[in-house]
């Protein structure tokens, strides 16, 4: 007797073995109750870039709100939906405005997010529309007040990030304005899933998603201590790959690495 999928529960391929576990559903098929805080160490670096070059990587109906590239490097540990395991991620976004059918939405558009484990990549791509792909991401290591990490693909180092507590940002007030934009409504994503067959050139799904900043949390969500925040100097080093270096991602790193930066801040 064949199975019947339960439309009230979440599934991901392969669906043959029952509902899946995601950040939004536990093994009993209910919402996860995060009774233990996820430990998050987050480093962010912001730098100016050429407005025309940034606009060239935006989808239709998006416009550039400010000529900045924002790179987040997060280390997540004690993640409840991963049974206490953790992973690293690095996301690249730009401040934008999306002109939708019902109005204009302002927020950062996530261009790409690298993660070092398949589980968060799959759930984020399929359920939330994140443009997630895989890379090896070193843990942040710190010595003498300088924190560093690097990203590699097939052994090719394509991105280095450095955060220096020994020096201040070049323009602290502007940095705060970019990172704490009061007009931002959240993080936007451009979801695209190709249709099977027909040359694989058409979309099964293609639309803009929003993670709203003002989303109301359930009443049973615990409150945890406020984040500890430090501003410091930083530096970005992109290494431009060939196709042989990063066979399926070379065009991503080439495009981002070609965005010239005149000013670097974190």
Can you say where each PLM-predicted feature lies in the sequence?
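N-terminal ordered "arm"
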Residues: 23-73
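Intrinsically disordered, low-complexity boundary segments flanking structured domains
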Residues: 28-33, 55-61, 81, 96, ...
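Structured loops at beta-to-helix junctions and adjacent beta-edge loops in soluble globular domains
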Residues: 48, 74, 95-97, 114, ...
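Short, structured protein-protein interaction patches enriched in aromatics and acidic/basic residues
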Residues: 65-99
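Low-complexity, polar-biased intrinsically disordered regions enriched in Pro/Ser/Thr/Gly
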Residues: 81, 101-105, 174
């Amino acid at each position: 007797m064949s199975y019947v999928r339960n439309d009230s529960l979440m599934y991901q391929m392969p669906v043959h073995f029952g509902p899946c576990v995601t950040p939004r559903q536990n093994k009993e098929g209910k919402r996860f109750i995060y009774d233990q805080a996820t430990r998050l160490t987050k480093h962010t670096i912001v730098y100016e870039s050429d407005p025309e070059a940034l606009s060239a990587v935006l989808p239709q109906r998006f416009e550039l709100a400010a000529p900045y590239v924002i790179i987040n490097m997060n280390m997540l540990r004690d993640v409840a939906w991963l049974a206490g395991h953790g992973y690293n991620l690095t996301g690249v976004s730009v401040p934008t405005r999306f002109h939708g059918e019902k109005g204009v939405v302002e927020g950062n558009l996530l261009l790409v997010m690298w993660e070092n484990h398949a589980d968060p990549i799959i759930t984020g791509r399929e359920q939330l529309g994140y443009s997630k792909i895989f890379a090896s991401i070193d843990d942040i290591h710190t010595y003498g007040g300088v924190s560093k990490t690097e990203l590699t693909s097939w052994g090719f180092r394509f991105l280095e990030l450095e955060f220096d507590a020994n020096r201040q940002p070049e323009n602290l007030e502007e940095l705060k304005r970019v990172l704490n934009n009061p007009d931002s409504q959240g993080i936007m994503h451009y979801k695209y899933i190709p249709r099977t067959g027909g040359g694989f050139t058409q979309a099964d799904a293609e639309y803009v998603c929003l993670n709203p900043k003002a989303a109301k949390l359930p009443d049973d969500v615990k409150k945890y201590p406020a984040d500890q925040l430090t501003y410091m100097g930083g530096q970005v080093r992109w290494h431009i790959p060939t196709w042989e270096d990063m066979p399926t991602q070379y065009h991503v790193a080439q495009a981002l690495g070609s965005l010239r930066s005149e000013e670097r801040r974190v």
